[in-house]
Amino acid sequence: MISAAIVGGTGYTGIELIRLLSAHPEVSIDLLTSRSEAGTRADEIFPSLRGISDIVFSDLGDETLATLQQCDVVFFATPHGVAMQQAEALTEAGVKVIDLAADFRLQSLTDFEHWYQQSHACPELLKTAVYGLPEINRDKIANALVVGNPGCYPTTAILGLKPIIEAQNKQSKQLIESRIVIDAKSGVSGAGRQASLALNYAESTDNFKAYSVEGHRHLPEIEQGVAQLLDSQFSHRVRFLPHLVPMIRGMLSSIHMELTDAGALMDWQQVFEQSYASEQFIDVMPKGLYPDTRSVRASNRLRIAVHQDNERAELTVIVVQDNLVKGAAGQAVQNMNVMFGFDESLGLNFAPIVP
């Protein structure tokens, strides 16, 4: 049994972490922090936790920081910039850190400072941090002290592109043209739990809109995934268009590419099936079937469909996930399982909720 702490337990990802870790047979949640709710039981704020967790929120003071250093793993479900203030002291004490914000996702300090408008507090630790996408970085995660949990959109994008880039790296010719278009839609929970006019019921219901078209913070993370994580041997230009749709949770990304003559000769359905044959959380749909967001709701599953149109020389990959689970808290637990040598599906092997 390992001791876990959750810093920032009142946001949607924090709530999901409590839900998932409370059911994990090898984890004890020994500390839960919130400045705004210190002294309050978690199940008083979130009735869904009644009978599951009666832990009391603590403030993040000096005494709490000392307690964090006695844990085996600390999850940061906090705004960007919080984890990097504490990570160095925690790792020096032998504590493993999983950050669900962006502090340890981007390896480039210049990119981090540009997109998040703040200086990095521990650039040396950033150099050793591991990007927490188990389907690609499993071996590195197993030996990591600090894991940067991926963003929700990049999870769909990078896993949707992985079989293509890997197949292309084995060839002497490009299989897809340079331009990649990612048209992504997220439920409103992806924007967080804070009060916002855009998330007001009257504003978000019966409404559908694009946002951050000029540039979203997840774009450099996707570009890093293609160029470095997947180590593409060819250059690609990614156009990323995020949208907010009137549903609570769920994400669907459509990835559009043009095939070269060599790419049109490939059987991309087979490529995807072979690439993910051993991945228990990734389901490649049979040819002609397309996933919907409800099929992965409240689960750590990610479903992929592949559509190849050789007449138009086009390849479309459709990816769905629950943005709060595989796109956030579930993936964090999956990373924890890898870091501590547990079965990767432990605490995560449950069916999606239907309807």
From Swiss-Prot:
Q: What is the catalytic activity of this protein?
A: N-acetyl-L-glutamate 5-semialdehyde + phosphate + NADP(+) = N-acetyl-L-glutamyl 5-phosphate + NADPH + H(+)
Q: Which UniProt keywords apply?
A: Amino-acid biosynthesis, Arginine biosynthesis, Cytoplasm, NADP, Oxidoreductase
User: Which SMART domains does this one have?
Assistant: Semialdhyde_dh
Active-site residues annotated for this sequence = 152
What is one process in the GO biological process aspect for this record? L-arginine biosynthetic process
Q: Does the keyword Repeat apply?
A: no
Location within or outside the cell = Cytoplasm
GO cellular component terms given for this protein: cytoplasm
| Recorded family membership | Belongs to the NAGSA dehydrogenase family. Type 1 subfamily.
| Described purpose of this protein according to its UniProt entry | Catalyzes the NADPH-dependent reduction of N-acetyl-5-glutamyl phosphate to yield N-acetyl-L-glutamate 5-semialdehyde.
This protein is called what? N-acetyl-gamma-glutamyl-phosphate reductase
Organism the protein comes from: Psychrobacter arcticus (strain DSM 17307 / VKM B-2377 / 273-4)
- Gene responsible for this protein: argC
